[in-house]
UniProtKB/Swiss-Prot annotation:
The keyword Electron transport does not apply. GO terms for molecular function: ATP binding; identical protein binding; phosphorelay sensor kinase activity. This is Sporulation kinase A. The modification Phosphohistidine is found at H405. Transmembrane segments: none annotated. It catalyses: ATP + protein L-histidine = ADP + protein N-phospho-L-histidine. CDD domains: HATPase, HisKA, PAS. GO terms for biological process: regulation of DNA-templated transcription; sporulation resulting in formation of a cellular spore. Residues 3-73, 140-214, 265-335 form the PAS domain. Keywords: ATP-binding, Kinase, Nucleotide-binding, Phosphoprotein, Repeat, Sporulation, Transferase, Two-component regulatory system. SUPFAM superfamilies: ATPase domain of HSP90 chaperone/DNA topoisomerase II/histidine kinase, Homodimeric domain of signal transducing histidine kinase, PYP-like sensor domain (PAS domain). The lineage of its organism: Bacteria, Bacillati, Bacillota, Bacilli, Bacillales.
Amino acid sequence: MEQDTQHVKPLQTKTDIHAVLASNGRIIYISANSKLHLGYLQGEMIGSFLKTFLHEEDQFLVESYFYNEHHLMPCTFRFIKKDHTIVWVEAAVEIVTTRAERTEREIILKMKVLEEETGHQSLNCEKHEIEPASPESTTYITDDYERLVENLPSPLCISVKGKIVYVNSAMLSMLGAKSKDAIIGKSSYEFIEEEYHDIVKNRIIRMQKGMEVGMIEQTWKRLDGTPVHLEVKASPTVYKNQQAELLLLIDISSRKKFQTILQKSRERYQLLIQNSIDTIAVIHNGKWVFMNESGISLFEAATYEDLIGKNIYDQLHPCDHEDVKERIQNIAEQKTESEIVKQSWFTFQNRVIYTEMVCIPTTFFGEAAVQVILRDISERKQTEELMLKSEKLSIAGQLAAGIAHEIRNPLTAIKGFLQLMKPTMEGNEHYFDIVFSELSRIELILSELLMLAKPQQNAVKEYLNLKKLIGEVSALLETQANLNGIFIRTSYEKDSIYINGDQNQLKQVFINLIKNAVESMPDGGTVDIIITEDEHSVHVTVKDEGEGIPEKVLNRIGEPFLTTKEKGTGLGLMVTFNIIENHQGVIHVDSHPEKGTAFKISFPKK
């Protein structure tokens, strides 16, 4: 061996690190000595994927190693420490099932970190005697065996402390040599890329002691300098009465090229997935095992850990559990074809979102799973509801106009004849007054119906002082409110706040809102009217201390004939909403049981 006179620092085996991985490669446990040997605290590794800590060239090696359920040899790979340095790790794997029905697997990983010793050792037997291997742990190479392996189709070589002493014909072909003399007698380090030298030294020393070493991937160099990627399996042996190393090499250059192509394809696919505006996720055994960035935003999660590994049914209404479970199971078992269905979910902010969902069968670590694509249609659904509501308003308005005109004509005749009959009804004036007041109420309802049909009719918009307008409305209703123990309190940011609108229609709006607020407090209370403004809008809030509006009614506020009052017509708020809409304003309703209701109207300044 050409490096016999050079002192080297071989790698020594440290204490075992134990880890438990989920079937998808996510670390669910690692022993506390990870901080000492790898630089990471337990909490920094648990929840992460093992591959994020591996050298990129070893990721496929480890991944394929996990797929093999018969791990006869340990696997050696490079691990990236927290300080970004690289250490070699030798790992043994055991696959266990966590359920009797064998639906979930866990990977038990027993790792040894191979680090440099502080003392100097030499591979030269004359300067450093390595403890000989026991006869029981050693395979002897005899002349008969040598003739047997000569024509093996796989490259094979034998070295003594790194110095090549035998190669078969396949090894010659792989290294591009014409004769064995071009290889025998040379150090194996001459053919191995420098980045692997430290781990090779460690493996040689261990085999010199008769210890087994694991499988490893290495890059060797042919005689013409061309790199060749190899999978190396090694074991201790005895060759011509010397402790030696038996190497069986498999050319994986084609596999490496394929892995590179696959990795690039995977990266492009991941880039496409991560940047998709639709949510793309994978469900396995009822849990989220993958989700892209759009999904994290859709469910309003703070981090991936809020969703990954969690039960999907946590985001579903209990009524939907059975349907979704059956749909996912049928798709996973390919019993039904993929179709677009509508599905609602709960976000982490307890907000309901509406989605279109497509389920596609896929696999997750070789097991049946379902890929889910979710498209947020919450805004579309809201728009559809607004259009439906607008259509209802239009139909109700047309119906109201027809009814109002049909009733007004006979009503005018009835009132006229009652007026003529009044002088002849001495002693029955009380009944006359009741009938006449009810007819006046019918007239008021007819006026509201006509307002609903064409709220913009006869509208004369002008520059209005909002403080003055609300003051007039408050004065009109204040006397009746005080009789019921209700105080109307008004507050303004400024004395003069102006908007552009129709005075009569806006008075109708505030009369309806203040009157509703007063009627919601039969036991007395306070009605607050607050006027504020910002750069673009003027805001008017009418707030009461009543019992509040039930949640099931709150979402239907403004619908025709919807009322919570015993004598209400269900038209007042509908007219109010219509007038505000025709003034390019918006109205927001906030109500809490036993705490009251607030109607906030926002008008544009211009």
